[in-house]
């Protein structure tokens, strides 16, 4: 999971999130305002309600299409995928200030798609516990140090300076492979 995108992988690739909800927010607000001004029970209100529903469905379809394409790309490319199990619903409710962004990127749906596509292809989908300190462990020397969410660069005493999400991705991959060997 990447807070300002969809994911960061252990190869250094970062997949941004297209933010479909954010892009349609102004138009949605305008349509909802128009809907609120219509008289209840009228044909014009029903038409306005359908316009709002159509835009919401379009936004959801855009997100699903993007997630299907990304999950298919990953499922075709890799034999083993290791992910961190995160509770995105709680992440969006805890007041981190990015609730809409967390829900807009569709990480939970993405993981579900990835899981069934990998299992259909006979590949491995490994879940690493959300309490595993992936961003706090140095991917080079293995030492652990506390960092805050504001720290975007992980700096270790061994001299390693690395993006926090990339460091976490490498650690999640290593832990996932360890879990796979243990199973």
Residue spans of the language-model regions?
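Positively charged, helix-rich recognition surfaces that bind polyanionic ligands
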Residues: 1-183
